[in-house]
Structure formats: C-alpha cells, structure tokens
C-alpha cells in the first residue's frame, strides 16, 4: 500500500506529528484513506494532499515542484492535543511543544513574528 523507494523499501512519512504525510500507491489511495479514517476517528482527519494543495493550505502561491514531489499524497492531520507518530523512542522522539508547525488549530495556523533590535 505504501510506495517503495528504488531499493524496495517503504517510503518514510514526511512532515511531523502534527502534519503527517504518507506516500501511498495511487491505486490504493482511497482504500488507505478509508482505513485510516476508521482507525483514527476522533483523533485525526485523513485528507488527500491534492485537496490541501488545491485549497491553498500551503500559501497563496502555486506549490513548488519540489514540495509536490516530496510531500506524499495522503495527509493525517491530528486534532487538538493529538499527535501521530510512525516511529517513537522514549526521550528521543517525544513531542513536548504545543502548536508545533503544521497543525490546523488556530494557534498553529497563525505565525507570529517579533522583530527586535540586537
């Protein structure tokens, strides 16, 4: 179901625990979306990346070729207070920050810039 690299190994997800992008075989995209929606009901939204790209979730400009080539085709977007991990090691890959870049909560969608003289 997951696309493979040239060595036959599954492609690892892109993004973070707050915006998780999978590389799914096109012919199995709907199947994967349905399976994940059922499994993650109440925890995360599962959305084809095309909907996010077409909806301007990555900005007003057209997404770059590099982004489209690397991002994957199925997004898992955890709800407030949730996260998704494909690999976890205690004390190494723990998420301690709320509002990590990438989520869809208002706090994560807003960027705050502070300029100060150094």
Protein language model annotation of sequence segments:
Residues 1-118:
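Feature captures the catalytic ectodomains and active-site-proximal regions of enzymes
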